[in-house]
Amino acid sequence: MAQRRQDGSAGDADYGAPGSTYSRYRRPDPRIAAVITQALGEARTVLNVGAGAGSYEPTDREVTAVEPSAVMRAQRPAHLAPAVDATAEQLPFADDSFDAAITTFSVHQWQDLPAGLAELRRVTRGPVVILTCDPARVQEFWVREYAPEVLEVEARRCPSPEALADGLGGSVSISTVLIPQGCTDGFTEAYYGRPEHLLDVEAQRACSAWSLVDPAVIDRFTRELAGDLLDGTWDAQHGALRTLPRYEGSLVLLVAEP
């Protein structure tokens, strides 16, 4: 059985910590949502595992959400159904209950990845769609120049796409998801062209890897990035990112058909 924190969180990060601000910073981006919707095909019943505050749940289908954190469940908007309190490793549903399943920015939190993937496959008749980060590419981001520890944590936590494919079996496609400029879903790479936003403590807290490093790392990051923005160093090296329409980072979409 997965070990859970006071608010029910079942991963290495305490999702009770960001409090009520998480959903302000992690709002689904419609351009990324369109990619997920396309991957779901004609599925009418969809399971969302690690659903959080409801990001990327399609509103034109029958969705069942699973989320272990009480804080995250409380932030679900009124137009979405309440989430079931459960973990990926022990889904309380019969075999083949859903046409499709999704999990977004969640697999790095699972305590037993093979068990969670087996459960997803067990309860899903059709495609399992996973939005995650490829650990092989996480450390290519400019944040490494200021807080490499954050990206090292992220790379260690994220399972490889190949491991996910092996765990799900069947026919699997893996594709890069381009991150749009002005992305409303505030994961770290979403700020590729808006570095000032990553000086916001609440923006950092909405990305769980930042909570898993020593506070001194955050202090150094904030001090050095702020200085480089003030004197133009960041823009001299990375300024082209401010107008880049889409950034090819570590974000990937995996679609596994049985």
Label each region the model flagged.
Residues 1-44, 55, 70-75, 127-161, 182-189:
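Conserved class I S-adenosyl-L-methionine
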Residues 174-258:
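Conserved Class I S-adenosyl-L-methionine
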Residues 45-91:
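Class I SAM-dependent methyltransferase SAM/SAH-binding core
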